[in-house]
From Swiss-Prot:
The protein's name in its UniProt record: Large ribosomal subunit protein bL28
GO BP, one annotated term: translation
UniProt entry tagged with the keyword Ribonucleoprotein: yes
UniProt biased composition (Polar residues): 11-22
InterPro entries: Ribosomal_bL28, Ribosomal_bL28/bL31-like_sf, Ribosomal_bL28_bact-type, Ribosomal_bL28_sf
Record family assignment: Belongs to the bacterial ribosomal protein bL28 family.
PANTHER family: 39S RIBOSOMAL PROTEIN L28, MITOCHONDRIAL (PTHR13528), LARGE RIBOSOMAL SUBUNIT PROTEIN BL28M (PTHR13528:SF2)
Organism: Alkalilimnicola ehrlichii (strain ATCC BAA-1101 / DSM 17681 / MLHE-1)
Alphabetical list of Pfam families matching this protein: Ribosomal_L28
Amino acid sequence: MSKVCQVTGKRPTTGNNVSHANNKTKRRFLPNLHHHRFWVESEQRFVRLRVSSKGMRIIDRKGIDQVLSDLRARGEKV
């Protein structure tokens, strides 16, 4: 499964580990993703999303119904 937030679209980025001697090796910065069940009152069911912490805050602010309608408009199956 890909490490992408379904709400924000956040995905891993790349960068460097830098040692004390200033040696650089490649690394990945992974988003803070969680599988989370949200209760959708209008559909009387739970929806399981893979969301980042920022995505959860967006759902708290906008509401799960608005976020789900945005996801469905993008063509994601929810």
